[in-house]
């Protein structure tokens, strides 16, 4: 009998792809073959997957983007993707199909339903996304990264936590260097696609900090491509040492070296912050579906590991005060780091692996 095959289907943002990568790494170590089904947008985030993972770009679409003609073609594109997935599964039958959300996961999950293959989904947020909500009643297991998670009536969830990449686990519980009179690192991350509001507010907020903090501060700021130039210029005008990029490939290292993190509260970002264990200021994305980013942040905030600032209340003066409070109180910052670490779920990947292997055993 050949090695079992896991088919991972994930959509085109880091929030979907990073947990998928964590599962792929774990299953490869267990001797499984792994394929990733995603679209061209998702493939941009697949560079960190193990090299033995075969990446299949699928045809999918969303009604959320494009004009009337593009929307009219959505069903045809999805149907084409489903037909292609069915044909692929008949050639090389997956032992388990797992979806991590996003429209590009529709073809593989639909094919798994049609062929009655073992199938499951993982939802990273405290509220199911549209695609996961559609498939939740049609899979054998619904794994939840945040608890409690709002689930459709009659659907039971299994709390696994959010898997993180091996690079994050390698930095888990890395010693926290408290703020002090020496070089300090501040990391600003806006999710896999950056955050304009952070680019608008953070540079000015940092520029308002007391000189004794600014003299030692180094900044790594993730920004949208169209914002990189103006954010870089804002830091330059203030005489601040800042590295501004659209995407940092070494976020785990940067988080482990940070005295403070300013971030959106996407599920992957919250998981990374808690497992590495760093004080954070979280600014939930106000337009997130069902306000799921506020739900994601709640655990760290209630654990007194993070400060929550609603987007509507974010301004340079208020943010600057919060940054200064953390960076000028080393004992309090150390306790925030400890609280974050206690909230983390470093075994989330193993819990998810258990569900995959359980479904595979039931099939044999």
UniProtKB/Swiss-Prot annotation:
Statement: the UniProt record of this protein carries the keyword Nuclease:
no
CDD domains per record: GT28_MurG
According to the UniProt entry, what is the EC number of this protein?
2.4.1.227
UniProt xrefs under Pfam families: Glyco_tran_28_C, Glyco_transf_28
Print the organism lineage.
Bacteria, Pseudomonadati, Pseudomonadota, Alphaproteobacteria, Rhodobacterales
Q: What does this protein do?
A: Cell wall formation. Catalyzes the transfer of a GlcNAc subunit on undecaprenyl-pyrophosphoryl-MurNAc-pentapeptide (lipid intermediate I) to form undecaprenyl-pyrophosphoryl-MurNAc-(pentapeptide)GlcNAc (lipid intermediate II).
Q: Supply the source organism for this entry.
A: Cereibacter sphaeroides (strain ATCC 17029 / ATH 2.4.9)
The membrane topology of this protein is:
Peripheral membrane protein
* SUPFAM superfamilies, per the entry: UDP-Glycosyltransferase/glycogen phosphorylase
Q: What is the top-level taxon of the source organism? A: Bacteria
Question: Keyword set for this entry?
Answer: Cell cycle, Cell division, Cell inner membrane, Cell membrane, Cell shape, Cell wall biogenesis/degradation, Glycosyltransferase, Membrane, Peptidoglycan synthesis, Transferase
A GO MF label: undecaprenyldiphospho-muramoylpentapeptide beta-N-acetylglucosaminyltransferase activity
Keyword Transferase tagged: yes
Q: Which InterPro entries match?
A: GlcNAc_MurG, Glyco_trans_28_C, GlycoTrans_28_N
User: What is the gene called?
Assistant: murG
> In which residues is UDP-N-acetyl-alpha-D-glucosamine bound?
13-15, 125, 165, 192, 293
Q: What is stated as this protein's family in its record?
A: Belongs to the glycosyltransferase 28 family. MurG subfamily.
GO biological process terms on file: carbohydrate metabolic process; cell division; cell wall organization; lipid glycosylation; peptidoglycan biosynthetic process; regulation of cell shape
Q: Name one GO cellular component term.
A: plasma membrane
Protein name (record): UDP-N-acetylglucosamine--N-acetylmuramyl-(pentapeptide) pyrophosphoryl-undecaprenol N-acetylglucosamine transferase
Q: What is its main location?
A: membrane
């Amino acid at each position: 009998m050949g090695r079992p095959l896991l088919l991972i289907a994930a959509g085109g943002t880091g929030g979907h792809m990073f947990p998928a990568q964590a599962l792929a790494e774990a299953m490869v170590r267990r001797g499984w073959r792994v394929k990733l089904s995603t679209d061209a947008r998702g493939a941009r985030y697949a560079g960190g997957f193990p090299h033995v993972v075969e990446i299949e770009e699928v045809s999918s679409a969303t009604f959320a983007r494009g004009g009337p003609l593009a929307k009219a073609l959505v069903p045809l594109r999805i149907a084409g993707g489903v037909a292609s997935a069915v044909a692929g599964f008949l050639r090389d039958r997956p032992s388990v199909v797992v979806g991590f959300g996003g429209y590009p996961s529709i073809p593989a999950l639909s094919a798994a339903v049609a062929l009655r293959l073992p199938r499951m989904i993982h939802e990273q947020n405290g509220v199911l996304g549209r695609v996961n909500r559609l498939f939740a009643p049609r899979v054998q297991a619904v794994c939840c990264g945040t608890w409690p998670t709002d689930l459709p009536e009659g659907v039971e969830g299994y709390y696994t936590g959010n898997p993180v990449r091996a690079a994050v686990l390698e930095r888990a519980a890395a010693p926290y260097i408290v703020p002090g009179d020496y070089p300090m690192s501040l990391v600003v991350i806006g999710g896999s696609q950056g955050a304009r509001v952070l680019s608008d507010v953070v540079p000015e907020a940092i520029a308002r900090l007391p000189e004794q903090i600014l003299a030692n501060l180094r900044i790594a700021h993730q920004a949208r491509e169209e914002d990189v130039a103006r954010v870089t210029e804002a830091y330059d005008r203030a005489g601040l040492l800042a590295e501004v990029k659209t995407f940092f490939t070494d976020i785990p290292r940067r988080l482990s070296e940070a005295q403070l993190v300013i971030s959106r509260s996407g599920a992957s970002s919250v998981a990374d912050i808690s497992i590495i264990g760093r004080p954070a200021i979280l600014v939930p994305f106000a337009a997130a579906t069902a306000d799921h980013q506020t739900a994601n942040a709640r655990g760290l905030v209630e654990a007194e590991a993070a400060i929550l600032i609603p987007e509507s209340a974010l301004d340079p003066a208020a943010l600057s005060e919060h940054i200064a409070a953390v960076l000028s109180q080393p004992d309090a910052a150390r306790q925030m780091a400890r609280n974050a670490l206690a909230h983390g779920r470093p075994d989330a990947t193993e819990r998810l692996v258990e569900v995959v292997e359980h479904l595979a055993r039931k099939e044999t």
